[in-house]
Regions:
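A post-motif C-terminal structural segment
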Residues: 1-145
Length: 145
């Protein structure tokens, strides 16, 4: 999650240091990953914690065990038998989120990725778009400058 914080800081720096009437800031990715947020954590639930309906009250899965907010479809966090998370500090720096399929590393996924824009021509970035359309949005800014 430190990369997410660094990206947020970089985007904020750009917003604070450019003229948005003359500049397009476009943030996107070329792929997604298999990390997901699982089933109904309350607003404000610790992102690295177990899912809770209210503070101190974990939501339990079909086997009666708590589960983490974040998990991976694959990766090094696979465990042959899922550990009892009620006795594990999932927010500890050395805790590794669970993965469903054993892999040496987590892989890319295939869903659409978000694109966020601010500034000149940002209104052209909306809804579901083909990735190559983002080039046209950037090109329009360049030729209409």
């Amino acid at each position: 999650l430190t990369d997410t914080v660094a990206l947020s800081d970089a985007v904020q720096w750009a917003v604070d240091n450019v003229d948005l009437e003359e500049t397009l800031i476009l943030v996107t990715a070329d792929h997604s990953h298999t990390m997901t947020i699982s089933g109904y954590p309350r607003r404000g639930n610790p992102i690295l914690g177990t899912v809770e309906t209210e503070p101190g009250k974990p939501l339990l899965d079909a086997t009666g065990a708590p589960y983490t907010t974040l998990s991976y479809a694959n990766g090094p966090g696979y465990k042959k038998q899922r550990p009892n998370l009620s006795t594990i500090d999932t927010k500890a720096p050395d805790y590794q989120q669970l993965g469903t399929v054993p892999m040496p590393a987590e892989t890319h996924a295939g869903e659409d990725v978000a694109a966020f824009a601010a500034g000149q021509n940002a209104g052209a970035v909306r809804g579901v778009m083909e990735q190559n359309r983002l080039y046209d949005v950037m090109y329009d800014v360049l030729i209409n400058d």
